């Protein structure tokens, strides 16, 4: 099996020298292509911090995170931004949909930023919306749809760019 994620000896500290808090302590694991992984633990155990580090929202204090052979802990600036755009898809717990955009516009946003042609955006949004059963709500705003529909909009937005 091909490793798509390697987490090696990662640690994450918050604060300064006089008041350090260790959020993650020497975590190691691998994920192979096709595997599904659940992260479980008590409140405050570092689950969100771990996922924020893997998703490049936060940086590790020590250790390495390797995604598809690339050590993301070494990426910075434009290289990190490019990696996020092309390799990752994010689904946030609270959806992070933009209230001033319709469901269609929220889903299409990443493609618009990547300067994909309008007809290709329309094709891809409608295709994913059809697969997720949300075609009928594409013209609605986030405040007009249910929590489950918001989750599907967020899921569509995460996969619209075909992240690896």
What residue ranges belong to the model's regions?
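ABC family nucleotide-binding domain
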Residues: 2-5, 10-164
